[in-house]
Every structure is written in structure tokens, then in C-alpha cells.
Amino acid sequence: MKLGSPALSRVLSPAVRARVARHAGRLGSLRRSAVLGALLLAVGAPVDAEAKGLTVDDMLAMQRVGEPAVSPDGKWVAFSVRDTDLEANRGRLDLWLASVDGAQVRRLTTHPDADSSPAWSPDGRWIYFSSTRGGSAQVWRIAAAGGEAEQVTKLPTDVGGFKLFPDGKRMVLALEVWPQARTLARSMEEDGAKAKAKGSAQIYDQLLFRHWDQWEDGKFSHLFVWTPPELGGKADDAKDLTPGLTTDAPTHPFGGMEEVSISPDGKWVAYLARTGTRDLAWTTNTDVYLVGSNGQGTVNLTAQNKAYDFQPTFSPDGKTLAVLSMVRPGYEADRQRISLIDLASKKTRVLTESWDRSASTLLWSRDGRTLYTTADNVGHHSLFGVDVATGAVKVLVEKGTSGSPQLAGERVLFARDTLRQPVELFTVKPDGSDLRQVTRINDERVKAITWGEYEQFSFKGAKGDTVHGFAMKPAGFVPGKKFPVAFLVHGGPQGSFGDHFHYRWNPQAYAGRGYGVVFIDFHGSTGYGQAFTDAINGDWGGAPYEDLMKGLDFALQKYTWLDGKRMAALGASYGGYMINWIHGNTDRFKALVCHDGNLDERMAYFDTEELWFPEWEHGGTPWGNPEGYKKHNPIDLIKNWKTPTLVIHGGKDYRVVDTQGMSTFTALQRMGVPSRFIFFPDENHWVLRPHLSLIHI
């Protein structure tokens, strides 16, 4: 999974993005209208006029619920809702408020700029939030009872994120500064001097000189403590907790304020930062630091571990810090263990060593006896409770995709979605009983759609192992008829195509156009044990390809409504690589779609930014282990290409650079293979602007 944090980086936090970015990173994106148009031409899917399946317009109309924050009394939840503003060609975020019992819901903000990241004041009177009103990202607040929002911070630079102290009197802010400046005021002076400089040359002496979709400019995100003027602080200044830091806190490109935790007494701040200088591009060493809220006494709590450590979370009594940790340096998809650091002795205890799942969030119960977490789990992303004393794990909500757990009185509130339900908020008792839905933001839209029915299946794949997948019927399914097949290949490669409502790779969008959809969690996927995830290392085109072909054969035999003579395969990121590999190994598909996929693994090493990824996956560098890069390299099988192919790439994709897509298209054209290239000059590894979702070809 390649995104900026461990495997979720390919798919978001190193914990939260350890599926939002982690799953996101190498999961990739796909523009549905363009792709579906190509498939209709190549495969000829019927569209049932009676069945109103999911369309791209429906996806854009869905309101995206996120960022739940429960009030101190546990009775209310503030959350963000993203609407698509087609005229402005962007998403717009507003804040909403609902009672935890689901009886009441109302909109709090309606400003055309983005309002996000709600956080409650300790007395429950105010909801603080980030907003871009006025052209700069600052902290604002609005009364929970309603009214006009008021600006809280008025700093001379954007606030990248914030977290309130437990007493509500101070904040930790993430601000981009020049590390040598030492103070915010001096950093602003440096900005002024840089603005006056003539010329645009950028000079680099080390990697990473660009990351994800941004070129490095010498500034880094630091953590500051800001005190409001009425309590003795300065409106335009703050105390740097990380002076001189030459990496980002929170980490870039996907880290957020979940990487920062404040002790219950407000005396300490735990945070995450990359470790290293010249080796940043080929090390995964990320450590958890502890610093006094006065800026004194910084200590590295995880210096002994040279792999990922992230998601620091103080216990209710402030004596213990829970963190997520990997143990293998250089491997971003290692198992994420829950570790407990005793802050008095600085000793660490691994809580979940015997649990063969990767935890991705951390939430303490009020009594400190349970840690709630979520993890990929056999095609789902489940909610779990972990006993802090014994490490015993209990599944609380198994099916669907669960995330963002919060304490809500005597219940646990969390976000949940499935393949036929966008994210809504739910609560459950701590023992996993009495599941209740809190919000119904998209109920009417969901009811208006004929959803493709789906089921999970398993088969004997590579190495004789059990492999899982999903099959989805077209929205207009008619017994006795056969339907063309959209065969989706997930990215990562350490990711999962599970029971999740995805806004880029959504199988229902294909089912809505008359396709039967098949997607397989091949060797390398997450949620089936670490050995299964590790199996892809050094074997990118081996066991995964075998799983895909065997899984498709199994589905064609089991689901007789799938038409094996009319099939298209589609994938992005690693999935795009696999499309190129499939192209060289079989001609069973009528059409192929390659989005942001590598053609040449050797050159891809020199193109990409996070070198630890190919070095682990292919067993070293191209000069140290050339056979590792040659073993399953699509470029060596171009001579076999003959299937019509659509190639899609973004110009700001620095993970899988655009020349890989251009090279794929060049090879197709030179070979005389019917092909088309869609290039998005301003998009990165994902295509995010709403209007680009509506492109028809």
C-alpha cells in the first residue's frame, strides 16, 4: 500500500490514512464516465431502462459524511458533510449536528468555503472548526446552539490543523514554517524575502525533493502551542514545540492531527515525525516524540524501533501512551501492532502480538480497560475491542467498513458504509450489541437506486491457499440472461477490495450500467493474516496473477449469469501494473483499462519518490538485485499485446509518474493496438475534480 503512511498510506493515517491515504496511496482512482463509455463500446453492456442503477451523477449527488466529534456529555455529534459543487468544480464541506439517539439533525454552517474538523470545547458550548473563509485556513468556532461563526485564530499563515487542550484554553496548531527561523514571526519575514527573490530555480541536495503531488520548497510543518490574547498570548504568534525540525509534523503527505495527542493534564504533547535526513526516501522509520507543552524536555519514545510508529493516544489517566507499530524497517505494509508505553518507566508492552490483523485506529474506553480499533478483516473493515490487560480481541461490528470510533455516553459511535450504503454514523454498545443508525443523510438517494446484489465467495488460489472475492449482479439483473463482466483489480498492492462504498472505485457504478462485477483479494491483500499480505513480496506477477485468473474462472463457473466471452479488466496503481501484466499474458479480455500503472518496474524505481517501497517489494535496488525488477516486468511482454486499451494518467502523479502512462500508450500505438490516452495535467495519483468524473469518450 503506498500512500505516505504504512500500508494505508496506500489506502490513510499512518493509521487513519493507513486506509486514506494508505489504502489510498497505491489504490488509485478511476474516472467512471470515461471508463464506462469505453467498456460500453468494447463489451456492449445492456442498460435496463427499468432499473435505476448507480450512476456517476448519483455518486456526485451523495453527501459524504465524515469527521464525527462527540460532545463532552455524549449526547450530540458534530460532523462534516461534503457536497459536490459542480459550478466551482470542487467539494464543499459544511458542519452538521445530530443527537446521538438519531432523533434530531440540523445543519450548522452554510458558508461557500470549506468548514471541517469539528472539535468541542470542554464545556460543550462551542464547536471549533477549520475554515478557509477569508482566503486563509484558520480556526473558527460556532455556538452549539447555533448562530454566527466567529474567527478564533488570525495568524499570518494557514493553519494546517488544530487540537484543543483539555482545558480549552490553548491549542496545538500545525503551521508551515522555515525550520531555521525558530519563531513564527521570523518565518514570516523569510517568506517576504523569498517572495522578492528573482528566478524560480529550485535546488536540491537530497531526496525527497517532491512527494505525492508537491515539490518540496524548504518549509516544514511544525507544531505550535497558541494561546489566545485574552489569556496572555499573541494573536499573531505561537510557541514552536518542534524548533529546527527538518521533517514534517504531522507527516506529509497524508498525516493529520490524529498524529498528535495531548495528555489529560495538558502538560505533555505526543506527536509523530519522520526520522532521518538523507535517507528519508528509503527508510520507513517514523517515531513518536513526547514534549512538554511549554516546549521543554523532548524525548523520542520509540527510538529503539527503526520501523513505523504512529497514532500516539494518551490513556484517560495520562500514564500510558498507546501507539501503533510495525517491526520490519523498510516495509510499509507490515502488521500494525498496538503497543503500550508506560510513561514513567518508558517501557513498551506489545498488546496485540498474537492478533493477526493490522489495527488502524485507537480509542480508549473511559475506564482505560479497553482499546477500540478497526482493521481489515476478510473483505470487511471491522470494529474491535481489545482488552488492555490481556490483549484479548473481540469483534464488535464485523460486516461493512467501520471507522472513526468515538465514545458517546455508554455507547461507541462510528462511521460505517457498505457496497450499497454511503457512510452514515452508527452507535453500538461496548459489547457489540444493539447496533443503531444515527444519521440518514443519504436515505432518499439510496432508496431511489436499484443496487446490484452482491455476495462474497472463496476458492482455492495460488499455493493452494483460500482466496476471497466478491461477485455483484447488474442492477437490471434478469434470471436466465448473461451479462458482460467488469473485472476490477485493486491497488496497493497491499489493500483490499471489500464491502466499502468507494467514490473512485465503486463496483456499483459498473453494475448500474449492466455489468456483472467481479473483484478478487489476491495474495498480497490485507485482512487475511500477515503471511497472506507478505506473499506478494518479490512475486508481483506470480501468485496475484494466478489468483486473479483462478478467481475469475471460479466466478464464471459459479455465477452462470456472467458472460465469459464479454469481459473487460480494469485497474489503477498496482492494479494498473497488473493490467499491463495481464495484457502480456492473456488475450481473454475484450478491453483493458490501465490507470496510473507502471509499464517498466526498473525505470519506475528511478521515477518514484518513496524508494523504500520498490526496494522492499523487489528485494533491493535495480543495480543490487536486477533480477527482482526483471522477474515480472510488463515491458518485456509488449510483443504479446493485442487487446484494445484505455490508458489514464495524471500529470501531478509523482508516485507513478506520467511517463509510465505515456510509455504504455506509445507501445500500444506502435504495436497497432486500438487504444486511447486520457491525460489529466493537474491531477495526481487520483482524479479528484468533480467535472472530470463526467468526461465522456
Q: Where in the sequence are the language-model features?
A:
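Non-catalytic accessory segments flanking enzyme active sites
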Residues: 69, 172-175, 196, 200-205, ...
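Residue-level detector of Asp-centered blade-edge/turn motifs that repeat once per structural unit
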Residues: 72-73, 122-123, 166-167, 264-265, ...
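Hydrophobic beta-strand positions that form the internal "hydrophobic ladder"
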Residues: 74-77, 124-127, 171-172, 269, ...
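A flexible loop/linker signature enriched in serine peptidases of the S9 family
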Residues: 81-94, 109-116, 130-140, 148, ...
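Short loop/turn segments that connect beta-strands within beta-propeller blades
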Residues: 99-103, 143-147, 228-232, 292-296, ...
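Short beta-strand element of the alpha/beta-hydrolase
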Residues: 481-491
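Active-site-proximal cap/loop segments of hydrolase catalytic domains
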Residues: 506, 511-513, 519-695
